[in-house]
């Protein structure tokens, strides 16, 4: 929610682009953007496996991260528009693709570094496109944001979840007595959702 409301004034019909679209955050961005009438380009590593599932959540385009000439081919599908916001959880070459997609004056917000590779920004992206680079660390935002802003965000998210408009995939539910197994499962590279500990079961 902070990603979509805190950096760019999005309006219905705008496009945004994100990598790691199959992550928990990525799935939430898809659903929240749909609620706002904002359209999404979603880069993933396994598009054929994920396209149907992410489209059901509200994704407009699901694209292979490493497809050949992916920026040009994807922009051709946007009817002359470009995304005004990019959500970056990966870094490295993936972040460069996001910046290349952006409209002049667009913003890329980085909240993760899954590739563990630094972002090397071509000078032209800053000089000629005027792209803005920002970071998001929710822990820091929670420390400094006004209490009413935090409450409003939680209230909105809770309402959407209660309505069924915001869902989160769950891979496995473990009883508290199996916390070790839960941690091991959470560290696996490929999962189909969150790992949940059920606190009222031993």
Locations of regions flagged by a protein language model:
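Short, well-ordered coil/turn residues at beta-beta hairpins
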Residues: 19, 88-89, 199
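Short amphipathic alpha-helix with an adjacent loop that forms part of the alpha/beta core around
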Residues: 69-81
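Mid-domain Rossmann-like dinucleotide-binding core that forms the NAD(H)/NADP(H) cofactor-binding site
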Residues: 1-67
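N-terminal Rossmann-like NAD(P) cofactor-binding module of classical short-chain dehydrogenase/reductase
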Residues: 17, 86-87, 109
